[in-house]
Amino acid sequence: FGCRGMTSQAYGEDQICIHAYLPWPHVSLLDLAALSLRLQQDALIAGQRVPKLRWERIEAEDWSSSWKQHWQPQWVGDKLLICPAWLDPPPHPGRHLLRLDPGMAFGTGTHPTTQLCLESLEMRLEGGGGAEGVTVADVGCGSGILSLAAALLGAKRVFAVDIDPLAVQATMHNRDLNGLTDRIVVAQGSLEHIPEMVDGLVCNILADVILDMIPEFRLVVKEGGWLILSGILIEQAKLVAEMLEANEWVVAALWRRGEWCCLNARMT
């Protein structure tokens, strides 16, 4: 039928729901009816319950832009307002306005890991004695949302890196959109592309990638510096914390939201 992918979800121990998206020109109602009959016959022969098959036609839509109508301004922490670049921001006294157009990159401020990192940056830069002269590295910058937040919260200079060229492009666009061109340096790559030692590092990617990077964090973070790490599931936190401690970092706080967590660590 031309199906290029499918998803499955278990309901209890004996039920599974399978979703498949089929290109309409390549499949007809007669084909679907024949598929339903074939599944029924196979189930009866195997002595299994007869599966239910349902289908509906989905009209063509520009999925790359239709999501925008569902994304609204959001307040994060006590100091930030994240606003889609195509909307007028609501009144925001006492908050920094962060305008964002993520494009194809990760990071809109809605995911728990992004929110945890934003709140941690606020604590470090505005609640930890100020951000005057502080430099920050954003590893795996995605849309650039964490770099933007760090700069808006007072960081003197932010170095944003990502291996994805689309993320680099998105970060540069959002940097310029927020008038932060002179304070955020963007490069394609990883830790080796951070040009100088920094006071703090934020990294919101995947736990496995973070584990591989931990031994190298001390090469780019100054003595007495700090880390903000997320993209980590609760069940992965212990392993990440142990790796940090093995590399002379102390986990100062673990913040949780749903199934995700954020580790705040400092150098021993």
Describe each region flagged by the PLM.
Residues F1-H92:
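N-terminal auxiliary segments of SAM/dcSAM-dependent transferases
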Residues Q41-Q48, G154, D176-T181, E223, ...:
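Short helix-capping segments at alpha-helix termini
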Residues A60-G130:
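SAM-dependent Rossmann-like transferase core, predominantly class I methyltransferases
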Residues M104, T108-S190, I194:
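Conserved SAM/SAH cofactor-binding pocket of Class I
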Residues L166-A170, V209, Q236:
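Conserved short alpha-helix immediately C-terminal to the canonical SAM/SAH-binding motif I
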Residues L201-V202:
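Hydrophobic beta-strand segment of the Class I
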Residues I214-W226:
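A short glycine-rich, Lys/Arg-flanked "PGG" loop and its adjoining helix->strand segment in the class I
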Residues L233-T268:
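Active-site capping/gating segments
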